[in-house]
């Protein structure tokens, strides 16, 4: 038994170190609370998505507020030639708090030609847990949990960033959970510039984006599929996402605003 004690000690140290606050936690900027920029009103936004300049998908996004609760819904899928090659229909819903800009739950349904994928993410003050259910399934779904807070969804991360002053050189660092994984996201404010969206030239705030993967032991890993990213937020009273580009392992992908209806209600 005494011979085994050193092994137990090593295992104990390994587990203890995994549960300690990770070194990167000191870089997270969300402890200061939300900024003072007003929260957006109810709205409908339409985006087109593509790869290397070619439109491949479209989605409608609805933002609805009721008291302190905020519901963000997105519905879309592949279009045109891309749909013939790769069929995808997506429904996404996020519930969050307006006061804290923190999410409570995300449910996402992805319907492909040969399978359906449902991802449920639950956020709490202790951690975040996700379950991905694939149909037809080869094995039962397994949950994934990270014990860290606060954690944002993609849309609430945007709410957080837009609430801040967004002065040139400012950096916002936060933990974002999307699909079935966690990431350390860094958003750096590059400055103000103009960008053409459709036929209109818009005043915009340019940001640079960086992501690192976070494993279940809160260790940072290189996100191999993502090389670099950038985005443009409208420099006005709305601060809506105008365009996002990401350099990935097969070129670059983008999302661009096609239509914005402030005050619109979901039909």
Q: PLM features: what roles do these ranges have?
A:
Residues 21-125, 166-267:
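Acidic, serine/threonine-rich low-complexity disordered tracts
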């Amino acid at each position: 038994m005494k011979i085994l004690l050193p092994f137990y000690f090593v295992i104990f140290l390994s587990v203890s170190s995994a549960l300690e606050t990770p070194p990167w936690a000191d870089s997270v900027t969300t402890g200061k609370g939300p900024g003072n920029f007003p929260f957006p009103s109810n709205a409908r936004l339409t985006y087109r998505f593509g790869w290397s300049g070619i439109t491949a998908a479209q989605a409608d996004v609805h933002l609805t507020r009721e008291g302190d609760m905020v519901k963000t819904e997105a519905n879309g899928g592949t279009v045109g030639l891309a749909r013939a090659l790769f069929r995808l229909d997506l429904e996404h819903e996020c519930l969050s708090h307006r006061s804290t800009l923190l999410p409570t739950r995300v449910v996402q349904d992805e319907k492909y030609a040969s399978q359906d994928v449902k991802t449920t993410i639950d956020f709490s003050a202790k951690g975040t847990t996700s379950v991905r259910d694939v149909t037809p399934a080869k094995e039962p779904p397994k949950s994934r949990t990270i014990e860290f807070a606060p954690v944002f969804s993609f849309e609430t991360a945007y709410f957080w960033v837009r609430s801040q002053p967004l002065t040139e050189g400012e950096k916002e660092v936060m933990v974002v959970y999307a699909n079935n994984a966690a990431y350390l996201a860094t958003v750096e404010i590059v400055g103000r510039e103009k960008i053409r969206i459709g036929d209109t030239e818009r005043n915009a705030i340019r940001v640079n984006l960086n992501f690192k993967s976070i494993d279940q032991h809160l260790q940072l890993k290189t996100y191999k599929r993502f090389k670099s990213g950038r985005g443009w937020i409208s420099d006005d009273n709305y601060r809506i996402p105008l365009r996002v580009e990401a350099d990935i392992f097969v070129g670059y992908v983008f999302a661009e605003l096609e239509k914005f209806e402030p005050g619109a209600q979901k039909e």
